[in-house]
Regions:
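ABC transporter nucleotide-binding domains
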Residues: 3, 10-145
Length: 145
């Protein structure tokens, strides 16, 4: 997967939060997105993943322009925000199947078990999300992403 950001900008009223940022990430690259609080990291990630409309510029994921093909972009990229929005009354397996069905992603029992194993949730998979530690809740969010 490649990501290309060109002159991406976002304003909240008169405050410029992201100002013409440009970068590209090639398939297979691992990068860190660092900066002080309020620097625009989360805002930039929300624009790249299609959860927030940019005021200027463009972001492409796998050659797909985010604001034009928002749903297709979301099917190509997972995003786990710091404040992980989970339905805590659901069981882990139930939640993963639910999220998959919302995004039209394969939710066979075999696929869900594969994801559970990959993120290290095997021993927690039969529990309600409300019973999990913060770390395991993050893993559920990662599995859902």
């Amino acid at each position: 997967m490649s990501i290309t950001v060109t002159n991406l900008s976002k304003n909240y009223g008169a405050q410029k939060v992201v100002n013409n940022i440009s970068f590209s990430i090639n398939k297979g690259e691992i990068v860190g997105f660092l900066g002080p609080n309020g620097a625009g990291k989360s805002t930039t990630m929300k624009m790249i993943t299609g959860y927030l409309q940019a005021d200027g510029g463009a972001a492409q994921v796998c050659g797909i322009t985010v604001h034009i093909n928002n749903n297709e972009t979301k099917s190509k990229i997972g995003y786990l925000p710091e404040a992980n929005p989970l339905y805590v009354d659901m069981y882990v397996r139930e939640y993963l199947a639910f999220v998959g069905s919302i995004h039209n992603i394969e939710t066979s029992k075999q696929k869900i078990e594969e994801i559970i194993n990959t993120v290290g949730l095997t021993l927690e998979a039969n529990k309600k999300i409300s019973q999990l530690s913060k770390g395991y809740k993050q893993r559920v969010g990662l599995a859902a992403a």
